[in-house]
Each structure stands twice: as structure tokens, then as C-alpha cells.
UniProtKB/Swiss-Prot annotation:
Molecular function as annotated in GO: cytokine activity; type II interferon receptor binding
Keywords noted in UniProt: Antiviral defense, Cytokine, Glycoprotein, Growth regulation, Pyrrolidone carboxylic acid, Secreted, Signal
GN (gene name): IFNG
Chain's role: Type II interferon produced by immune cells such as T-cells and NK cells that plays crucial roles in antimicrobial, antiviral, and antitumor responses by activating effector immune cells and enhancing antigen presentation. Primarily signals through the JAK-STAT pathway after interaction with its receptor IFNGR1 to affect gene regulation. Upon IFNG binding, IFNGR1 intracellular domain opens out to allow association of downstream signaling components JAK2, JAK1 and STAT1, leading to STAT1 activation, nuclear translocation and transcription of IFNG-regulated genes.
Signal peptide: 1-23
Highest taxon above the source species: Eukaryota
Name recorded for this polypeptide: Interferon gamma
GO terms (BP aspect): adaptive immune response; defense response to virus; humoral immune response
Origin organism lineage: Eukaryota, Metazoa, Chordata, Craniata, Vertebrata
Protein's UniProt keywords contain Glycoprotein: yes
Subcellular localization, as worded in the UniProt entry: Secreted
Length: 174
């Protein structure tokens, strides 16, 4: 039960950090409800340091947050699935899931369904393994960072848009 408390305490930190939800009263209330339910304000919750927050912060330094955010969101969806039958906190979980849906999936049900579908693929199934390896060569190029093939053109004149004389060109100075 202590690990569950720790996880939900970090849920508060992570959700606030990811969504900037300081002005969203109902979301904060629901997170506070979960904290109270799991007694996550207890001193033993902090033992061993943060579970997810430090990892997220270290990835933000590099600017590659989408990868780790998707793993963290996946973690929370699994956590919420494990807590699904608990009626005392179901409304809080639904509110937080709705906020994640808007912020992480841009309110796209298709993206949410694809995400959930990916998290439920049984990786121990030999048929799934064969299909995944077969598709690997096609998938890998889409996973690498995109290099900008087009370079931005620079303006030939100064900020004001006026004509600027070219150095060492007598015709432009006359």
C-alpha cells in the first residue's frame, strides 16, 4: 500500500508539472481527494525519493519530453486501470483522465484509442513478436528525429526592409 501512496503523491506533482493546472480548481480538488484517500501526505511516502518527477525533469533539460511523457502517461493509465473498481475515488480518477485526454492527446479520441491499444499489445505472444520484428525496418525511420531539409532563407536587407548598400560595390554607392 505504501508504493501506491507514493505513486499517487507523485501523480499530483506530475500532473501539476505537465499541465500547469494551478488555475483548474476541480482538477486540484480531485488530486487532493486522491492524496487524502491514499494518505499520501504521510512522511513515509517521501522515502527513496521521487518515482517519476526527477526522470521527467532530466528529460526536459534535453527537450525530448514526448518520449518520456508517453511512458509516464502509460504508467498512470495502468495505475488508474488497477484502481478502476474503487468507487470512493472513481470520480477523481475520471477527472484526471479527462484532463490527460485534453492535454496529452489534444482531445483526440483516435489518439487515445491508439495509445491504449499499444499499451495492451501482449509482447510475450510469439505472433506479435514476429509481426513487430517484420515491421521494425518500416517503423524505425519514423521514430528518428526529423532533420530540417530546408534551410531558412535570410533576408538580404536590414530589418526595416530598406535597400542596404552592398560593400565594395561602387554602383550601389552612387
Amino acid at each position: 500500500m505504501n508504493s501506491t501512496r507514493c505513486i499517487l503523491a507523485l501523480l499530483l506533482c506530475l500532473t501539476q508539472a505537465m499541465s500547469g493546472c494551478y488555475g483548474q480548481g476541480s482538477l486540484i480538488e480531485e488530486i487532493e481527494n486522491l492524496k487524502e484517500y491514499f494518505n499520501s501526505s504521510s512522511l513515509d511516502v517521501g522515502k527513496g525519493g521521487d518515482l517519476l518527477f526527477n526522470i521527467l525533469m532530466s528529460w526536459q533539460k534535453d527537450g525530448d519530453t514526448k518520449i518520456i511523457e508517453s511512458q509516464i502517461v502509460s504508467f498512470y493509465f495502468k495505475l488508474f486501470e488497477a484502481l478502476k473498481g474503487n468507487q470512493a475515488i472513481q470520480r477523481s480518477i475520471d477527472t484526471i483522465k479527462a484532463d490527460l485526454f485534453v492535454k496529452f492527446f489534444n482531445s483526440s479520441m483516435e489518439k487515445l484509442n491508439d495509445f491504449v491499444k499499444l499499451t495492451k499489445i501482449p509482447v510475450n505472444d510469439p505472433q506479435v513478436q514476429r509481426k513487430a520484428v517484420n515491421e521494425l525496418l518500416s517503423v524505425m525511420p519514423h521514430l528518428s528525429p526529423k532533420l530540417s531539409l530546408r534551410k531558412r532563407k535570410r533576408s538580404r536587407c536590414c530589418f526595416g526592409g530598406g535597400n542596404r548598400p552592398v560593400k565594395n560595390n561602387l554602383a550601389s554607392t552612387i
